[in-house]
Regions:
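Conserved GNAT-fold acetyl-CoA-binding loop/helix
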Residues: 21-43
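Conserved beta-hairpin
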Residues: 53-65
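Conserved GNAT acetyl-CoA-binding A-motif
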Residues: 110-121
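Conserved active-site alpha-helix within GNAT-family acetyltransferase domains
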Residues: 100, 124-144, 148
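Conserved beta-strand in the GNAT
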Residues: 62-71, 88
């Protein structure tokens, strides 16, 4: 299959929102508020400082997946770490190369921009996603994540 990767725009907000609602339910059993999610997606699409959405499209132009890319500055290493977030590929396109193609495009871009690494976090129970990331050459790192809701 021939894939294409594009940056998301405001015109893609509803598609990305649907992906996020589906991803939260599927991967974590979480039902998100659709109004909150679409506003969050629109905010991300409207403000490049928040990050960049990337879409993977099939040959016919249909959007089959997306991810959100953010950047973290490292004062320790004087470089950027790029974070992949909100990954979703429609079920019927999984294991057909859509994510691999999108990931490789983002990796090429990260290398060309001098990023030190690509990072992401994944739910501990989402073993399928963990295996997918390992197939891309990613390794589990030594950091644990902590959070305090405020």
């Amino acid at each position: 299959m021939n894939w294409k990767v594009e940056r998301g725009s405001l015109a893609d907000a509803e598609t990305i929102t649907k992906f996020q609602l589906d991803m939260a339910l599927e991967s974590e059993g979480t039902i998100l508020d659709a109004d909150t999610v679409i506003e969050g997606v629109r905010a991300g699409l409207s403000d490049p400082a928040k990050g960049t959405y990337y879409l993977v499209l099939e040959e016919g132009g249909e959007t089959v997946g997306s991810l959100f890319l953010t950047k973290e500055w490292s004062d320790w290493n004087n470089c950027w770490y790029w974070w992949i977030q909100s990954v979703f590929i429609r079920a019927e396109y999984r294991r057909r190369g859509a994510f691999t193609y999108m990931f490789e495009e983002v990796r090429r871009y990260a290398i060309s921009e001098g990023a030190a690494s690509l990072r992401l976090y994944v739910d501990r129970t989402n073993v399928k996603a963990q295996n997918c990331y390992k197939k891309q050459g990613m390794d589990e790192c030594h950091y644990l994540m902590y959070e305090e809701s405020i």
